[in-house]
Amino acid sequence: MNLVTRPGRVGIMGGTFDPIHYGHLVTAEAARWEFALQKVIFVPSGRPPHKKDYPVTDAEYRYQMTLLATASNPYFEVSRSEIDREGFSYTVDTVAEFRREYGPEVQLYFITGADAILEILTWKDVDTLLRECHFIAATRPGFQLNRLEESRPQLPVEGRHRIHLIEVPALAISSTDIRWRVKNNKPIKYLLPEAVEEYIRSRGLYRPRLDGVYEKG
């Protein structure tokens, strides 16, 4: 794939981004390059249905951290689509919103992890999703591709060719680990952009209060 960006290809990267880190950014840039995407739109989730029983940091904080993390890349944008929407954040609703905005000619590419793709049959209105957009499944070195291939026959026939694999560098970074490190006064430098690190510290995010409740989310 050359450096020339094909018009009419837009990437969508959803996630809680609690907090956003270099793993997210590397994945988005790898997908943009490999699939010649015009841009990648980061969509912090509002109320993710798969995490309804887990505490998630206030959406405005996560949105601001995502803005800070993506500011240096002119091909990255951040959308308030899900955090301003009432109710649970379903991917099919987000894709429909971008389809209305960009029209029928633009190809939409939803970027996610390969592990998430393995659960795609449980997603709301999966048939509609696979008609409206392509999926880029980011794998790590050592990921067992046969797991994905075994699930492909269960997908709607017209959607099987819309799932693409891309291998990204093995960055052992997770939002869960970053939250744990902040809580336990461990360093998080080089795990996420410096501006995000400073935002976390200045807002007191991920630190427990004396009553055991996490400060601000």
Swiss-Prot record:
For this protein, the Enzyme Commission number is 2.7.7.18
Q: Which CDD domains is this protein grouped with?
A: NMNAT
Q: What is the uppermost EC class here?
A: transferase
From the record, give the transmembrane residue ranges: none
Enumerate the InterPro entries for this protein.
Cyt_trans-like, NadD/NMNAT, Rossmann-like_a/b/a_fold
Q: Which GO terms describe its molecular function?
A: ATP binding; nicotinate-nucleotide adenylyltransferase activity
Record's catalysed reaction(s): nicotinate beta-D-ribonucleotide + ATP + H(+) = deamido-NAD(+) + diphosphate
Q: Which UniProt keywords apply?
A: ATP-binding, NAD, Nucleotide-binding, Nucleotidyltransferase, Pyridine nucleotide biosynthesis, Transferase
Do you know which Pfam families this protein is assigned to?
Answer: CTP_transf_like
Name its pathway: Cofactor biosynthesis; NAD(+) biosynthesis; deamido-NAD(+) from nicotinate D-ribonucleotide: step 1/1
* PANTHER family per the UniProt record, alphabetical: NICOTINATE-NUCLEOTIDE ADENYLYLTRANSFERASE-RELATED (PTHR39321), PHOSPHOPANTETHEINE ADENYLYLTRANSFERASE (PTHR39321:SF3)
Q: Which function does this protein serve?
A: Catalyzes the reversible adenylation of nicotinate mononucleotide (NaMN) to nicotinic acid adenine dinucleotide (NaAD).
Q: Which NCBIfam families match?
A: cyt_tran_rel, nicotinate (nicotinamide) nucleotide adenylyltransferase, PRK00071.1-3
* Family recorded in the similarity comment: Belongs to the NadD family.
Q: What is this protein called?
A: Probable nicotinate-nucleotide adenylyltransferase
Q: What is the lineage of its organism?
A: Bacteria, Bacillati, Bacillota, Clostridia, Moorellales
